[in-house]
Amino acid sequence: MTNQRRTGLKNLYREEFLRSPAWFARRNRWFRDHTATGALPCAACGVVTVKDELELHHRDYEGVRITQGVWQAWEDDDDLVALHPHCHELLHRLIDRDVVLARHRTRRDASDHALRALQLKLHDVQAAS
């Protein structure tokens, strides 16, 4: 098991699923449900922003399926976390570079741990500013 990102042809998730109609429909549904009360904060830095400035991070891939060549997006709402693109990249770097998070934790546990660490680091940076 590995939580590290895969590159190139080995990653059907990034190359196909994230470009699929199923993912765009699921993403739109998540944002519709979560922006009913207004703008959203980035889960890492806490800055409130709009849908077009956020990406969704998968805490778990259980809802991502491919059946007879067709992608399906059955993620629970709590499997997805809204992040600025830069914060999303930092989160993946924390997971990729930590051997324990990358190889010895579930995807959900690794994501949650890395997100907490990122929140603390970004809070420290904001407090110092």
Predicted regions and their residues:
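Short, charged surface segments at domain edges that flank catalytic/cofactor-binding sites
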Residues: 2-44, 66, 71-74
